[in-house]
Swiss-Prot record:
The keyword Plastid does not apply. It is found in: Cell membrane. The lineage of its organism: Bacteria, Bacillati, Actinomycetota, Actinomycetes, Bifidobacteriales. GO terms for molecular function: potassium ion transmembrane transporter activity; symporter activity. One of its GO terms (cellular component) is plasma membrane. This is Probable potassium transport system protein Kup. Keywords: Cell membrane, Ion transport, Membrane, Potassium, Potassium transport, Symport, Transmembrane, Transmembrane helix, Transport. Transport of potassium into the cell. Likely operates as a K(+):H(+) symporter. The gene is kup. The chain crosses the membrane at residues 1-21, 42-62, 84-104, 126-146, 159-179, 195-215, 235-255, 286-306, 334-354, 364-384, 390-410, 414-434. It is a multi-pass membrane protein.
Length: 649
């Protein structure tokens, strides 16, 4: 399991050495403008950032705070939501920023690895300076990566872990080999070098260099988010090895820079990458192969994380219900086609706009600083209410100070492409916020009826032979989980302008269980043979094509005598003599022009309904399309006010 943990949680942080020092050199104006103070300074900042942010904040503190073993910003919010409604805002913002940054991770990880082909002597005549070919190879890999998502990654998960273990071992070895040429770089373990460099004239980038330093910590949030997949113990067990490998690699690159800063061959080399240059040409072939694999694995981890986060947001009613597939036997392995398509298109758009890793990394990380800040706020709230108030204050002051420094430093990336991820963050935040607000308004007007109030009226309609049958069975799908009541919307639908008389009315809700192959149902008939409340529980691997299950339930009740036999004079598609025709009805809400609702509420509802229209239809989710379901639009009653009276003239 520890090996699997490597593949799941360390892919992102494991690709940071590919581009962190390259971005540093670009910001300093090249290797020729980088002296010993600059190299020791950046190494010190990187080491202490990994130590404080990744090790202390996430590994030592955050992982002790879990929600039934699950980590991540949404799981954390679910744990503390009772302490204030305002906590939804940082949780939404952090989740939106994490999803936005997921678009850049595949682009920067894979493109930086593919660009290593340009350093291979055998391919240099073809690849050198040929940015278009590098871009095309990157695009092909990314398209293939997204194309195979629907097949699941369970079978290759253990392979991922093995590859990442080899990758980190490789980072440690090549770093140590170069470090052995100049052990003096270990002086950078002293934090004074980092602080002095940050404010010295040796630092051409100024405080913006912290935006580059932050790249070395970009996988830290994934450690916490994926805790539920691999377990806290496995991360505790493997993290020391990971950190040592990262330190060796970064310090090895530092030693190489110190040994070659005055080498004229590198003075005017554009996009110089110390990671590949510190290796001999023969070793670079292995490095490129492993780095591409590591980039794919890092991308896979972020894609899987995006699926999980969207699924969690749906359960919090912050996002619409989307079609979810489970290619594997575990619920953690899920696939959401809409999310996959959006991520793929957005990643390709990033590649089209920024072209190479140098420009992508210039935009990378800005949104993730927002996620880390919001996670710090939520963690501080938990620690505060856990009775450790002094610890909460110290934690908040220390880590917000560091992360706001990262944020303001990364704001220098805004005009260089950071605007794209911030725009994406705001778009996702808008979806979450308006969906949540719209859902609150809908629930505020939702009413329910007790059996004593509705059964007598339904009985009269059931026995009223003057009204023709609308259908033998009318099935309403409802999201209400309670079995001992009936949604008022269903009652209104039945007694609309033309009452829907039936031999039986059905209110059906569908729940998804954690057991992959659950197939069970429960029924409440309220002491009647014409009104049934049904709850169907299906495993997450089971098809949610409802008609087949409804038909089986009706047959079971008919055989048990709870449902009278329904004979029909005309042939039916299913040729079942005991069950009459079935009509499905779905109720959608719509805002009335005269509804008394605030402008903000009206906008939230309008956006929610627009998103719902684009996100897909329950008709497709529940396999109802062949049955021609009736979709009813019911008004959303929100303290409606009487319209002004007309004057007769």
């Amino acid at each position: 399991m520890a090996i699997v943990a490597l593949g799941v949680v360390y892919g992102d942080i494991g690709t940071s050495p590919l581009y962190t020092m390259q971005t540093f050199l670009n910001g300093q104006g090249g290797l020729a403008h980088t002296d010993r103070a600059a190299v020791l300074g950046i190494l010190s900042l990187v080491f202490w950032s990994i130590t404080l942010i990744t090790t202390v904040k996430y590994v030592f503190i955050a992982m002790r705070i879990d929600n039934n073993g699950e980590g991540g910003i949404f799981a954390l919010y679910s744990l503390i939501r009772k302490y204030g409604a305002w906590l939804a805002i940082p949780a939404m913002l952090g989740g939106a920023a994490f999803l936005a940054d997921s678009v850049l991770t595949p682009a920067v990880s894979i493109s930086s690895a593919v660009e290593g082909l340009e350093t291979l002597p055998l391919l240099e005549p073809i690849m050198s300076g040929n940015k278009e070919l590098t871009l095309m190879i990157t695009i092909v890999i990314i398209v293939c990566l997204f194309a195979v998502q629907s097949r699941g990654t369970e079978r290759i998960g253990r392979t991922f872990g093995t590859v990442v273990m080899i990758w980190f071992s490789f980072l440690a070895v090549v770093g140590l080999v170069n470090l052995s040429s100049d052990w003096s770089v270990l002086e950078a373990l002293n934090p004074v070098y980092g602080v002095e460099f940050l404010f010295s004239h040796h630092n051409a980038a100024g405080l913006a260099v912290m935006g580059t330093v932050f790249l070395s910590t970009t996988g830290a949030e994934a450690l916490y988010s994926d805790m539920g997949h691999v377990g806290r113990g496995n991360i505790y067990f493997t993290w020391p090895f990971i950190k040592i490998a990262l330190v060796f690699c970064y310090f090895g690159q530092g030693a190489w820079m110190l040994n070659h800063w005055d080498d004229t061959a590198y003075n005017h080399m554009h996009g110089l990458n110390p990671f590949f240059e510190m290796m001999t040409p023969s070793v670079r072939y292995v490095a490129v192969l492993l780095s591409v694999c590591a980039g794919v694995i890092a991308s896979q981890a972020l894609i899987t994380g995006a699926y999980t986060m969207v699924s969690e947001a749906t359960r919090l009613n912050w996002m619409p219900h989307l079609q979810v597939r489970y290619p594997a036997r575990t619920r953690g392995q899920l696939y959401i086609p809409v999310v996959n398509a959006v991520l793929c298109v957005s990643t390709l758009l990033v590649l089209a706009m920024f072209r190479d890793s140098e420009h992508i990394s210039a935009a990378y990380g800005l949104a993730l600083t927002v996620t880390m800040i919001t996670t710090t706020i939520l963690l501080a709230v938990y620690i505060w209410h856990d009775g450790k108030r002094v610890g909460a204050v110290v934690f908040t002051v220390v880590f917000l100070a560091i992360q706001f420094l990262f944020f303001f430093a990364s704001m220098a990336k805004f005009l260089h492409g950071g605007w794209f991820t911030m725009l994406l963050t705001l778009a996702i935040l808008l979806i979450m916020y308006t969906w949540n607000e719209g859902t609150k308004l809908e629930r505020a007007q939702r009413r329910h009826m007790q059996p004593a109030d509705c059964v007598p009226v339904l009985k009269r309609l059931h026995e009223d032979d003057s009204i023709p049958y609308f259908a033998d069975n009318i099935v309403y799908l409802t999201s209400d989980p309670e079995m001992k009541r009936v949604d008022t919307d269903i009652f209104f639908s039945i007694f609309a302008d033309h009452p829907k008389r039936a031999r039986a009315w059905w209110a059906v809700s569908v729940e998804t269980s954690d057991n992959p192959f659950t197939r069970e149902y429960s029924v409440e008939n309220f002491g009647t043979d014409f009104l049934f409340r049904v709850r169907i529980r299906l495993g997450f691997k089971v098809s949610q094509s409802i008609p087949a299950y409804i038909h089986q339930i009706m047959n079971d009740l008919s055989k048990s005598g709870d449902l009278p036999k329904q004979t029909t004079r005309y042939p039916k598609l299913d040729a079942d003599p005991n069950i009459g025709p079935i009509r499905y009805v779905l109720i959608h809400k719509a805002l009335m022009p005269e509804s008394k609702v605030s402008q903000k509420g009206a906008i939230s509802l309008q956006i929610k309904y627009a998103i719902r229209h684009l996100a897909g239809s329950p008709v497709k989710w529940f396999g109802l399309a062949p049955y021609n379901p009736l979709i009813e639009i019911q008004p959303l009653f929100l303290a409606t006010e009487r319209p002004p009276r007309l004057k007769r003239v």
